[in-house]
Amino acid sequence: MAAAGGSSNCPPPPPPPPPNNNNNNNTPKSPGVPDAEDDDERRHDELPEDINNFDEDMNRQFENMNLLDQVELLAQSYSLLDHLDDFDDDDEDDDFDPEPDQDELPEYSDDDDLELQGAAAAPIPNFFSDDDCLEDLPEKFDGNPDMLGPFMYQCQLFMEKSTRDFSVDRIRVCFVTSMLIGRAARWATAKLQRCTYLMHNYTAFMMELKHVFEDPQRREAAKRKIRRLRQGPGPVVDYSNAFQMIAQDLDWTEPALMDQFQEGLNPDIRAELSRQEAPKTLAALITACIHIERRLARDAAAKPDPSPRALVMPPNSQTDPTEPVGGARMRLSKEEKERRRKMNLCLYCGNGGHFADTCPAKASKNSPPGKLPGPAVGGPSATGPERIRSPPSEASTQHLQVMLQIHMPGRPTLFVRAMIDSGASGNFIDQDFVIQNAIPLRIKDWPVMVEAIDGHPIASGPIILETHHLIVDLGDHREILSFDVTQSPFFPIVLGIRWLSTHDPHITWSTRSIVFNSDYCRLRCRMFAQIPSNLLFTVPQPNLHPYLLHHVHPHVHPHMHQHLHQHLHQFLHPDPHQYPHPDPHYHHHQQADMQHQLQQYLYQYLYYHLYPVMHHHLPPDQHEHLHEYLHQYLHQYLHQFLHHHLHPDLHQYLYQYLHNHMNPDPHHHPHPDPPQDPHHPPHQDPHQHPDPHQDPPHQDPHQDAHQDPHMDPHLHQHQHPQPQPHPQQHPNHPQQPPFFYHMAGFRIYHPVRYYYIQNVYTPVDEHVYPGHRVVDPNIEMIPGAHSLPSGHLYSMSESEMNALRNFVDRNVKDGLMTPTVAPNGAQVLQVKRGWKLQVTYNCRAPQSGTIQNQYLRMSLPNMGDPAHLASYGEFVQVPGYPYPAYVYYTSPHMMTAWYPVGRDVHGRIIVVPVVITWSQNTNRQPPVPQYPPPQPPPPPPPPPPPPPPPPASSCSAA
């Protein structure tokens, strides 16, 4: 023992000795001689602190290296297990012996680290036991956020079922790490090298994994998905499965989930559910809905089919070969049937391209009068109306269908299924669906001829109608679409190759899923939240059409007929308002009555507009004959216009348009025509007839020109007072939803359809702004002016010049600055204020060399706030008001204008009505700040000292 531990005179080793050494020297110490062990402790205390911790750092590094080797060892063992499974499945390979590999496994372990050998090397043979099944191994995780939850659950399940000991956190972390691939494996390697404590804390490691790879917006995305989820044409089982999958990511209570589940059900199931006792749980609600759906299906199958049996029965179901079908058509012989089957011809009509169950001849024979059957798009021939023939049973599985949401201002959202067909040339909508939902229509610029797959034109003829721009949502994807109106009974909406080529979506045909990941959709089709309106404009009336004022003087010319005919054509055809849908049951015997009523409407419309303008511009001596002249001329002109110049197909559209917009109130206007008495000319107020000899109540045009310096003088020359809309609504009028705001006979609503200009200054991506500038303004120069005046130019330092170049280049790239063709460009002035460079714009200097047209300027509310908080208003007439009203000027002055916001897929400019307002008080230029800033005023002088007290007198002292 003395030999083992008594070498007290030997120097200590470089690292300090461990605390539990084997020195068992019990020799008593001499009080006079210092002990060698005390000398060693004193020397150990004098060493630096980093050398004292050197042993611990080295041990920790060795442990980390061994643990990383253990991770690689586990991965190799799993790879070997995969090979063993492949060899077990192959009956021919029986000579495989895993013993050599098992003998080589201990070579990777460290002989000095006995603990690591016991934790990693010893349990390795357990992976080769028969109790562990290879199918229970979790799938490799590559960092996909959608697969993080299943991966964590599979790892937990495997560790609980496995015979291997996973009680140590280090083994659990190594196992999970071996299941990571791709970017997830790279993250785990770097994370474990930096944070070594995670190797001994399985819970903390899984929390870090979840924090990195879990979708932070998972809950918000689940809320949006579950609110848009609808049952649609599918069964309740599929709807409930999708609902429960989304509900897993939400923390909603069960009553909230039950309410949302009922919102997405079909109306028939929801109606039947309301007649029963309310279920208590979500599972009971789903079970009740499934029972209701099955009962409705049984009732529908037991109900006799009112349609003709020949439409749904196959041709070989008839037994009598001599029984005529349709009176004159006999049954086919066996030879003829065999020939048509071999040549893939229709068994009903003998033509190619379709089969007997979808034969258009059969559909046209059984279709009602006035409705032509035929294909809806360029593709396979379509069938007859859906109310006569039911679709085939495989219709829901053969085609790619999606659920669309169509938004129209002031109307409930429409949910409709659409088919995606790459063989269709455009985007189509069924005319029955349009009529049923009153979707606004307009006449196309050019008719479109659509052909079927066999090259023949469709039976419904050329397409002459299209819908207005509608907001269409497909999941999180929002766009603006215009559909061509045709006949498509099986699919109300068809999205064709034009839609596919524009958005370029990623379609997975096996799962029927669509992902919009193209650059076009990322920048233009994102879902924007509706921004609430902070202010409501004072509602003006729409402005008088400019070219109507332009043609006032030609109207009083002797050649008035030609100019009025040209004006009426220009006014009717490019009218921005909607054309009503055609009535499929229109009969020709109603044409005479319709033309008579149409003539009265047009007479009232033209008389109402022409009389006040002509009364204003004609000499006073011609006022008394003005009514008689207009009365005779308009009757003669309209009769000739309707019978010789206007196409008969447009009569009905024009009649319905004027009937909806000019139908007089029966309580106030029993006669649609103006009075025939020349002493009672047409009125300026729709409810009162003023005297024609009385001067118009408007001011003198020369005085109007000086009323407001911001107004265009040319506009005031033709300005005339217009009638005020009736303040009272008709009692039979249906009450509008609270979405509208009634103000003076007009309504204003939140601009849902203008979402793409609300966020025009909000970047949708890093340094990417949506395009919002349509045209480049043209500046008219004063004749003789050579150039616009410029300010003084001062030299700039190199750093200031680089800062200006970077600023301009960055904003041109982002789209906030656009190159212009205007003379002299923009007046950019670089100023240095408070140690910061700023770019300002001098907007007063160019006015001395340009023509001041005083265009109507648009002002937005809350100009100091971000621009996307501004709201726009659109003005439409209240139904029941008989006359279109026009702008009248009050203070502050307001009117409407068409503002370009972009282009559609055809390249046509999309304009929206906006509010234009100007006022002397709200448009004053702010004072220009002085540079350098003025010195503060000097402080006021101090107050004078108080006067001294008077001296005391001798009398008072005595």
UniProtKB/Swiss-Prot annotation:
Name of the protein in its database record: Retrotransposon-derived protein PEG10
Organism: Mus musculus
Comment on protein domains: The protein is evolutionarily related to retrotransposon Gag proteins: it contains the capsid (CA) and nucleocapsid (NC) subdomains of gag.
Acidic residues biased stretches: 47-56, 85-110
Database matches in SUPFAM superfamilies: Acid proteases, Retrovirus zinc finger-like domains
One GO cellular component term: cytoplasm
Chain positions covered by the region annotation Disordered: 1-58, 84-110, 299-337, 360-396, 661-739, 921-958
Pfam families: Retrotrans_gag (PF03732)
Gene deletion effect: Embryonic lethality resulting from placental defects.
Entry-annotated residues carrying Omega-N-methylarginine: 753, 844, 857
CDD domains reported for this sequence: retropepsin_like (cd00303)
GO MF, one example: zinc ion binding
Zinc finger (CCHC-type) in chain: 344-361
Glycyl lysine isopeptide (Lys-Gly) (interchain with G-Cter in ubiquitin) cross-link site: 362, 365
Induction record: Up-regulated by MYC and during adipocyte differentiation.
Function, in words: Retrotransposon-derived protein that binds its own mRNA and self-assembles into virion-like capsids. Forms virion-like extracellular vesicles that encapsulate their own mRNA and are released from cells, enabling intercellular transfer of PEG10 mRNA. Binds its own mRNA in the 5'-UTR region, in the region near the boundary between the nucleocapsid (NC) and protease (PRO) coding sequences and in the beginning of the 3'-UTR region. Involved in placenta formation: required for trophoblast stem cells differentiation. Involved at the immediate early stage of adipocyte differentiation.
